[in-house]
Amino acid sequence: MPDISLKVLSNEIKISIQELIKELSIIGITKTEDNYINVLEKNILLKHLESKKKYSLDTLVLQRKTRSTLRISTVGGKNKSVQVEVRKKRAYVKNNKFENESFLNEKKVIKHSMQKTSSLKNKEKKYIKNIEKIELNKSDSRSLNTKKENKLKISNKDEQNKKFNQHRESNSFDLNHKKRIKENKDIRISHKEEKQDYHLTTFLHARQAEDENDREVEIDKRNHGRILKNYRQKKNNKNFHNGRYNKEEIRTFNRNKKNSKQKNKPILLQQVFQKPESIINRDVIISNTITVSDLANKMAIKSSEVIKNMMNMGIIGTINHVLDQDTAQLIAEEMGHKVIVHRENALEELIMKDRDTGNDVSAIRAPVVTIMGHVDHGKTSLLDYIRSTKTAFYEAGGITQNIGAYHVKTDLGSITFLDTPGHSAFTAMRSRGVQITDIVILVVAADDGVMPQTIEAIQHAKEANVPVIVAINKIDKTDSDIDKVRNDLMKYNILSEEWGGENIFVSVSAKTGKGINKLLNVILLQAEMLELKAVTTGMAEGIVVESFLDKGRGPIATVLVKKGQLKKGDVILCGFEYGRIKSLRDASGNEVFSAGPSIPVEVLGLSKVPFSGDVVTVVRDEKKAREVASYRKEKSREKKLSNQNRINLENMFDDINKNNVSELKIILKSDVQGSLEAISGALLKLSTEEVKIKIIGLGIGGITETDASLALASNAIILGFNVRADTSAKKIINSEHLDLRYYSVIYDLLDEVKAAMTGLLSPEYKENIIGLAEVRNTFKSPKFGLIAGCMVTEGVIKRSNPIHILRNNIVIYEGELESLRRFKEDVNEIRNGLECGIGIKNYNDIRVGDIIEVFEVREMKRIL
């Protein structure tokens, strides 16, 4: 067939050329008015137009949504509700011709079915008449048997013949019944098919069609069941017809009742709950703790039943009573259920087992050496000389305030150094440094000797069972005394090998470099004796030495690898945090792709800043790592809440006394995690019985607008350690005149907080006696009552000051003067050796010989 132009095709299908071009563009064929179309493109276009006509204006599409909730049990044993939505879509087409044809066909089918049902009813009537005749014959035979015994055999034969006929008729009834059921089914099927066609053609009867189908199904089921039941009763029971007639009479009697209309209505099927005949045994998942109500829900019984069972076992509780795992298991098993004990840390154990630990072949690793000692004894300077750097020169105040990890490669071998702070506030930091180290270098200044932090470092080393090498520093000074240092260390069981001990002593100078090579040789010799080895392949494990928040890069942790290979892109789990490693940098700031055992690296990619000392573990799945981290965080929170003091009589009185205690509220921000822990611990130790330090907020990084708003709401001071406030925070601080202080040395911070606490102390009041007067005589005054005539024996008697009245050196009254006169004139003060008259306010029991003591109260400032 030749190609057709678009104009001819538009005339054929009666569509304008513009619409035709649009339809062609929809199916991906681009044409213009002057173009031609081939046969294949024409067929595709016609199919497209037919499908478009399928849902025309005479078609109505209905959508129905049904929503329901489904409760399922999760892995943790808790019930979880899931929303289920079922969507149905139906299209109803309106076609008058098809509707009329289907309506006529339906009428024919109904007439045909009515004729068949009338013929069936006539057959049933004939069958009933035959049965009545048989029953009458049976009664006649019984009467003949009583009168004539000789005709018994004949009557038996007649009965057998009748039974045979009856059996034959029953068989014919069975066949007729089966035919009738088939015919009804055929009628019903044809009727349904016609009705389906009918209902598809019209929208007005759409819902009625569904209801009619349901009703007919129910009626057919009941009729079918009734016919089968009647046939079985007829077959097995001789009195079937009498019972049937009685039932029909009962049925006709019931029809005359008031509610007969409701009873004759067809009843649709309804879902009815049926109580189980026996107890259903369920699988009950029990966690570490569970309440009685939750346990009852999991066993699908009432809470009262669980409480009854508990009382039988000797446990008294309510629905909110919390049961431990063992008790809940006993209760559930007692009630016949199977218990599945759920371990909350099962996911953590699973994720730790699913790790590639390498080939378990150990190799020699570099020793981890921690440098410890007192403040300003030259620890960082010694390390700077070894590394050829000037770290101590740039440190604030010339003191180290966080742990620094460095890997040094020398001609003799590789060594990893950890530089710890020497200040007393950094005790926890030093203890953490000892726990991850192999060798401790105890630096003691030759001119200063053994100091408190030196003793503390010795104790930490002994607790960790780590060998100690003593480096006596500053030997280049003129006032250095090496023998004195040896004697002082001997008191703490640190003996040199020369004196028969186990510790190696090396005299060094961090300034000139004297003895440094010998110290490195001793370290490597000690490491060789310890035979330090680690697995160098597989997933890595390490420990966080220090962590901080970088403004540009985010949370950063300094990690010391213990075993395995830490690589870029690994998923790590670190305490309460997790993440994928984005970058690895060594101590010099150079980016590396992997790090082996005893190598410290800076890790970038964690969700938040971890705590120093947290264990870093490489895992496979980031999603599971997030779940374990959130589980750890939740358990830590629950532990904190459980450790809070419960209300009892003792702490109730403590809370009452707290009203007399002043609080200094502090918001603390630091640059690194270790310094934050050290400062917060030192501040809390400053608390006294009268002034308490309350840290309401602490964190790593700069001071933000949130910190300033919190300080404004809680009336707190803001302390920044090596951090600064941003622009938005400065606006709030300046406008609200908040107290913001910056520090770079921990000494200054602690001293100023002590001064602030001193200002919060309540002042002391001291009584200072300024004068004594002896009562010589008493007389009455109409205005002031009893007046004491006195002689001033010491000091000065002032009118405005308070007084004590002493009798036999015992204070019997404390009050104030009401009048002070000399020669009937009011005066303000009377000096020593003069007489005066004194009137005491609200006191008339003054006697001769009493001593009036005049004093003044002075306010004294207190010091912590």
From Swiss-Prot:
Residue span of region G5: 509-511
Pfam families: EF-G_D2, GTP_EFTU, GTP_EFTU_D2, IF-2, IF2_assoc, IF2_N
Region (G3) location: 419-422
Lineage: Bacteria, Pseudomonadati, Pseudomonadota, Gammaproteobacteria, Enterobacterales
Cross-referenced SUPFAM superfamilies: Initiation factor IF2/eIF5b, domain 3, P-loop containing nucleoside triphosphate hydrolases, Putative DNA-binding domain, Translation proteins
Stretch list, region G4: 473-476
Assigned keywords, A-Z: Cytoplasm, GTP-binding, Initiation factor, Nucleotide-binding, Protein biosynthesis
GO molecular function, a single term: GTPase activity
Residue span, tr-type G domain: 364-533
Protein name: Translation initiation factor IF-2
Function: One of the essential components for the initiation of protein synthesis. Protects formylmethionyl-tRNA from spontaneous hydrolysis and promotes its binding to the 30S ribosomal subunits. Also involved in the hydrolysis of GTP during the formation of the 70S ribosomal complex.
Annotated spans, Disordered: 140-179
Annotated region described as G1, given as residue ranges: 373-380
Localisation: Cytoplasm
InterPro entries assigned: DNA-bd_dom_put_sf, EF-G-like_DII, EFTu-like_2, IF2_assoc_dom_bac, IF2_II, IF2_N, P-loop_NTPase, Small_GTP-bd
Source species, domain of life: Bacteria
Family assignment from sequence similarity: Belongs to the TRAFAC class translation factor GTPase superfamily. Classic translation factor GTPase family. IF-2 subfamily.
Annotated binding of GTP, by residue: 373-380, 419-423, 473-476
Encoding gene (name): infB
Entry annotated with the keyword Nucleotide-binding: yes
Feature: compositional bias, Basic and acidic residues: 140-171
Primary localization: cytoplasm
One GO cellular component, as annotated: cytosol
G2: annotated span: 398-402
